[in-house]
């Protein structure tokens, strides 16, 4: 299937989000759609699949002009959209998820052909390299396995084009390899993929071509062999952003935080490490190794069962997030939408949440202080929004992440914990987040950064703490750290 979108325009409430956008994909092609958050990538694909009606432009499929009334019609025609938030019902079986809305029945009796559906589901998944039983509950599978189920569902509707939005955001390295194997198998069979992602290494590994949007407009198309990381970044942001990771200039000082023999039953045991003033400590390890559990313990979200925590040399008890905040410890969680933000609240309301005491006069929240704090933080972090009253759910991923960071900067943290700080964030916003981390450490504060992106860990960390199966695999100085040395420790080697 060959799709061509020309001069596509779309506005919401008079605000243009797409202006003469273009996109073209060939049969059997894996085509990346890139741009900063808010560039219009998802909107363009929603227009293709009938979720939104375009204001102008044309869509041709195999030479014939087409318009879909809704996503179901697009799916029936062979175009499937797998969203970042997977459409899997955890309490249904694998087969029930795959046959949802198209169940096999005995005539008109309403009785399901459960055994037949289970067998077909197992066979379809086995062809994609996933060997699970159709009768298993989908909620028992990993996110990577659920993603393969989504692809299998699309293929059951005879999809010729599969759109994937941030497909690897929550996958382990092994699951990413499995996904790429499936994509490579299907592209040989003529299936095309639109691959929306910010992960440059993956795009250069799996894709054939890249189309770039900026501020809702078509910037250009490049074939992978003919372009470079720097050119793509420059096209996305409209300027050269210089070095990928900003230079570190902070002075490393005394120990600000220490954990000794920290243990949480079933999660991690005997974890000991230090963080110093002015330092960024990177934390690496495989998914499920216990990295996030350790951070939750530091923040008092899931307190230690045993072990000690010291702040500036003094032992402290952290049994709740309130205890952590009193010690000026801030935690920016990996799941900003469900744990970091109240999506229906405005930017102002989200920023106020951990800062109610400092924004109050007496015991009454001061509107004046709140408004000033919101304006200051939006300016400091370059949050792109119409005003502080805009609902955070309407912001791009990068701007949502900036709001999460901004609300915690209000407590003037001496230790800032960032868990996957740039997941789902575009290149320009990543650079701004890195600059915030550097600014904090230059002022003598400390940062712990948990990341699954090894180039990010290597580019930003002064030292790297590697966690393996709930234990400290090792701690690497900057000059010792490499992708190979980190992975060796993360997998139990030396």
Curated annotation (Swiss-Prot):
Name listed for the protein in its UniProt record: Ribose import ATP-binding protein RbsA
- Which InterPro entries does the UniProt entry name for this protein? AAA+_ATPase, ABC_carbohydrate_import_ATPase, ABC_transporter-like_ATP-bd, ABC_transporter-like_CS, P-loop_NTPase
Entry's family note: Belongs to the ABC transporter superfamily. Ribose importer (TC 3.A.1.2.1) family.
Domain ABC transporter, chain residue ranges per copy: 3-240, 250-494
Predominant place of localization: membrane
What membrane topology term does the record carry?
Peripheral membrane protein
The UniProt transmembrane annotation reads none
SUPFAM superfamilies, per this entry? Answer: P-loop containing nucleoside triphosphate hydrolases
Quaternary structure annotation from Swiss-Prot or TrEMBL: The complex is composed of an ATP-binding protein (RbsA), two transmembrane proteins (RbsC) and a solute-binding protein (RbsB).
Q: Give the residues the record marks as binding ATP.
A: 35-42
Q: Name one GO cellular component term.
A: plasma membrane
Keywords, ordered alphabetically: ATP-binding, Cell membrane, Membrane, Nucleotide-binding, Repeat, Sugar transport, Translocase, Transport
Where does it localize?
Answer: Cell membrane
Organism equals: Bacillus anthracis
A GO MF annotation of the entry reads: ABC-type D-ribose transporter activity
Catalytic reactions of this protein: D-ribose(out) + ATP + H2O = D-ribose(in) + ADP + phosphate + H(+)
Pfam families to which the protein is assigned, alphabetical: ABC_tran
According to its UniProt record, the EC number is 7.5.2.7
Its biological purpose is as follows: Part of the ABC transporter complex RbsABC involved in ribose import. Responsible for energy coupling to the transport system.
């Amino acid at each position: 299937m060959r799709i061509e979108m020309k001069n596509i325009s779309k506005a919401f409430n008079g605000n243009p989000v797409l202006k003469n956008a273009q996109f073209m994909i060939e049969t059997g092609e894996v085509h990346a759609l890139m741009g900063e958050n808010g560039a219009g990538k998802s909107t363009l694909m929603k227009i293709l699949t009938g979720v939104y009606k375009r204001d102008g432009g044309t869509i041709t499929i195999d030479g014939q002009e087409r318009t879909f009334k809704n996503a179901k019609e697009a799916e029936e025609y062979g175009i499937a959209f797998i969203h970042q938030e997977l459409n899997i019902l955890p309490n249904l079986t694998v087969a029930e998820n795959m046959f949802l809305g198209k169940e096999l029945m005995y005539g008109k009796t309403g009785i399901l052909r459960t055994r037949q559906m289970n067998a077909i589901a197992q066979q379809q998944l086995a062809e994609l390299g996933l060997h699970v039983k159709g009768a298993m509950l989908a909620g028992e599978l990993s996110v990577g396995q659920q993603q393969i189920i989504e692809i299998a569902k699309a293929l059951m509707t005879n999809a010729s084009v599969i759109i994937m939005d941030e497909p690897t955001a929550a996958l382990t390295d092994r699951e990413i390899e499995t996904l790429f194997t499936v994509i490579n198998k299907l592209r040989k069979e003529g299936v095309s993929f639109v691959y929306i992602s910010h992960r440059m290494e993956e795009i250069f590994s799996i894709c054939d071509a890249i189309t770039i949007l900026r501020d809702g407009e078509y910037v250009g198309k490049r074939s992978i062999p003919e372009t470079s990381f720097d050119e793509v970044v420059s096209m996305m942001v409209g300027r050269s952003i210089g070095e990928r990771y900003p230079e570190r200039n902070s002075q490393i000082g005394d120990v600000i935080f220490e954990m000794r023999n920290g243990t949480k039953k079933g999660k991690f045991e005997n974890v000991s490490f230090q963080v110093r003033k002015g330092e960024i400590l990177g934390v690496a390890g495989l998914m499920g190794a216990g990295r996030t559990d350790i951070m939750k313990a530091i923040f008092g979200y899931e307190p230690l069962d045993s072990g000690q925590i010291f702040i500036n040399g003094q032992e402290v008890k952290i049994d709740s997030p309130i205890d952590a905040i009193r010690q000026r410890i801030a935690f920016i969680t990996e799941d900003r939408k469900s744990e970091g933000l109240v999506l229906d609240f405005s930017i102002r309301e989200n920023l106020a949440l951990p800062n109610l005491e400092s924004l109050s006069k007496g015991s009454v929240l001061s509107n004046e202080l709140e408004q000033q704090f919101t304006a200051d933080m939006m300016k400091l972090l370059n949050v792109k929004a119409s005003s502080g009253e805009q609902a955070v759910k309407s912001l791009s991923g990068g701007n949502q992440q900036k709001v999460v960071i901004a609300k915690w900067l209000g407590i003037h943290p001496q230790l800032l914990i960032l868990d996957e700080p740039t997941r789902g964030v575009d290149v320009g916003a990543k650079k701004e987040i890195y600059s915030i981390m550097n600014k904090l450490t230059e002022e003598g504060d400390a940062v712990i950064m948990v990341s699954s992106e090894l180039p990010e860990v290597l580019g930003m960390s002064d030292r790297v703490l590697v966690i393996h199966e709930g234990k400290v695999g090792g701690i690497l100085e900057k000059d010792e750290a490499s992708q190979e040395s980190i992975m060796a420790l993360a997998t139990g080697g030396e």
